[in-house]
Amino acid sequence: MYSIYNLIPKNTQIIIPTPIYINFLKAPKHLKRKVQRLPMVNDKGRLVIDFNKLSSIAKKNSWLMFVNPQNPGGTVYSKKEIKNLSRIIKEKNITVFSDELHCDLILQKNLKHTPLGSLKTIEKNVLAFYSASKTFNVPGLNCAFAVIPCDNLRKAFKQNAEGITDDANITGLIALSAAFKQGWKWRDDLITVSSTHLR
């Protein structure tokens, strides 16, 4: 997390929709980065970003923290919502840290995750992060990974991560490979059981 915020030049606007995982707010404070909170709104029981508000407050070349599926609200953004967001990103040239760690753990069968970076018009604005830890219950094994299409951003991220973020270890790599190659039946059973707890 620190290696991400270290990428952001000082005095650059960082927009963080709230509520959010608390460390996303703590890290920039320790690095003396300025955060602009964007309170999310309740849209028929879904906690979502107010895109009109985002468009009005976002400055050119700002950064956005985006979480999809949203944590703690659980909202899975629709493809239409992702496209609406992408227009703002393109218009303002916003760079986005996209936390998509829960993308494989969606309990409602009628909902589908759309990766923000899958939209070609903005793919080079997106640093997307994934992990097997949430869905496959393997936290602590250093098996998260990033998808960063922009060469300059990817090089800067790797450089900033040196000495801050540990490299992947062999145990984590094996766990990641096993989860994504052989863990889907287990994931499906997990979703079936977890779905019974929805109210």
Please place each PLM-identified region on the residue numbering:
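Conserved coil-to-alpha-helix start sites within the AMP-binding
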Residues: 1, 20-24
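Phosphate-binding glycine-rich loop
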Residues: 1-13
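A short helix->loop->beta-strand "cap" motif at the edges of active sites that frequently abuts
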Residues: 12, 33, 91-95, 123-124
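Structural detector of well-ordered beta-strand residues that form the stable sheet scaffold
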Residues: 15, 36, 97, 127-129
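Short hydrophobic alpha-helical segments of the AMP-binding
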Residues: 28
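Active-site phosphate-binding strand-loop segment of PLP-dependent enzymes
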Residues: 36, 41-111
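PLP-dependent aminotransferase class I/II
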Residues: 125-195
